[in-house]
């Protein structure tokens, strides 16, 4: 993989990790179109770039969540967890994120081999699920923005969004798309649904990063320059994608992404079954 290809793949990763169009599908499509196969080291640093992007964008919230978690541990030691939990929205948020991450962790562990086989399969698989992503987005935009935000978020809404994230382990189902849609279905405010979706992505991306990192010692192919440019491209484009989507969801619907998913999904699906791709 040369530097230009690395930058393209990095941009695709950064944009599609956070825009509701499925990073897994687009990485498969992009690598297929460019005729390249990314190395383990490259994948590790792409995930690191995406992780840093979301951590930096929500740094104020992350700092408050870390503080709230430590205070919550103190509450447990002092036998006043319930009192602290209901008095501080960030204490609730950090525990809700932890609990909502459990479904995707279980799916990843229990169905790892089955999911990997889908990623290694024909292009029509991610193309089909990309079309499904478009349908989920379109239907979710027909619902009015709810009133649930940080102040009144409950365990029920958190688990429902966590289940949406678990479904998105399938190639072509957008993680941000399914979680935002799940949030809207269960009554979250549109802007908060997107924000919670992004914060919920942090442990998921971190988990993928750690899983790949454990095999880093087996790497023999290491193109440092390509990895650096891919990492920077994923970081910068990921940050911009988060910023743009949060601005967009305040003013307009996400129908444009639904139409995009339908068009790309149909083109790639037809191209795959007719062996054009």
From Swiss-Prot:
Entry's Gene Ontology molecular function annotations: undecaprenyl-diphosphatase activity
Which keywords does UniProt give here?
Cell membrane, Hydrolase, Membrane, Transmembrane, Transmembrane helix
Cellular component GO terms, alphabetical: plasma membrane
Per the record's keyword annotation, is Glycosyltransferase included, yes or no? no
Swiss-Prot/TrEMBL catalytic activity: di-trans,octa-cis-undecaprenyl diphosphate + H2O = di-trans,octa-cis-undecaprenyl phosphate + phosphate + H(+)
Enzyme Commission identifier(s): 3.6.1.27
> Which parts of the chain span the membrane according to its record?
1-21, 38-58, 93-113, 118-138, 168-188, 191-211, 222-242, 256-276
| Pfam families xrefs | BacA
The membrane topology of this protein is:
Multi-pass membrane protein
What subcellular compartments does it reside in?
Cell membrane
What functional role does this protein have? Catalyzes the dephosphorylation of undecaprenyl diphosphate (UPP).
Stated family: Belongs to the UppP family.
Q: What is this protein called?
A: Undecaprenyl-diphosphatase
Q: Which organism is it from?
A: Methanobrevibacter smithii (strain ATCC 35061 / DSM 861 / OCM 144 / PS)
Q: Which gene is the coding source of this polypeptide chain?
A: uppP
């Amino acid at each position: 993989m040369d530097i230009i290809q690395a930058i393209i793949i990095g941009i695709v990763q950064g944009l599609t990790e956070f825009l509701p169009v499925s990073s897994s599908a687009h990485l498969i499509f992009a690598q297929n179109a460019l005729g390249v196969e990314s190395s383990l080291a490259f994948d590790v640093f792409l995930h690191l770039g995406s992780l840093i992007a979301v951590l930096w964008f929500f740094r104020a919230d992350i700092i408050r969540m870390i503080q709230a978690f430590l205070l919550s541990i103190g509450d447990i030691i002092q036998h006043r967890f319930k009192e602290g939990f209901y008095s501080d929205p960030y204490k609730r948020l950090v525990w809700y994120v932890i609990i909502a991450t459990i479904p995707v962790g279980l799916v990843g562990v229990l169905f790892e081999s089955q999911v990997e086989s889908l990623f290694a399969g024909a292009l029509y698989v991610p193309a089909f699920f990309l079309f499904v992503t478009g349908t989920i987005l379109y239907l979710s935009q027909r619902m009015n923005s709810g009133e649930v935000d940080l102040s009144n978020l409950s365990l029920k809404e958190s688990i429902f969004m966590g289940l949406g994230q678990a479904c998105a382990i399938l190639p072509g189902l957008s993680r941000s798309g399914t979680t935002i849609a799940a949030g809207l279905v269960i009554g979250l405010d549109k802007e908060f649904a997107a924000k919670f979706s992004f914060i919920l992505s942090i442990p998921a991306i971190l988990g993928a990063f750690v899983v790949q990192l454990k095999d880093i010692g087996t790497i023999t192919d290491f193109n440092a320059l390509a990895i650096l440019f891919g990492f920077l491209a994923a970081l910068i484009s990921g940050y911009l994608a988060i910023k743009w989507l949060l601005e967009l969801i305040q003013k307009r619907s996400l129908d444009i992404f639904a139409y995009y998913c339908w068009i790309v999904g149909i083109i790639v699906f037809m191209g795959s079954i007719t062996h054009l791709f």
